Amino acid sequence: MKEQLSEIYWPLRITYGLVPLLAGLDKYTNILTDWQHYVSPTAASMLPMSVQTFMHIVGIVEILVGLAVLLGFTRLGGLVVVAWLALISINLLLAGYFDVAVRDLVMAVGAYTLSMVAAERAEEYVPSFATGGVRPFAHQ
């Protein structure tokens, strides 16, 4: 069973590690797109900072989440990606980018699948190397 899960696990882990990482880096270069255009006017009006500054903060979060997934925090990182993509989708719906919102919701399903496959592989939410062997979320 573990071999079969690996065929699913590794492509998902690499994808959901690299995509947020690269998207986060692109928040500083805008090579892929000008990300500020995707912030809905409703969201922009609630920000206590410029949209550009907000997108830089978003970039940092995406870089950290991508690294977490790539470095073995896959089960927890996958769930963070699910929540992150759901929030992005809500913003995109408010901005009228329905096609992109649907794409991000589909990606959220894939991230959920990654987290569930990691759970099936008996991965902890936080790898033991990060906790010095202590299992902070272990079931009693």
PLM regions: where:
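Extended, low-polarity transmembrane helix blocks
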Residues: 1-33, 48-60, 64, 70-140
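Perimembrane loop-to-helix junctions flanking transmembrane segments
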Residues: 36-50
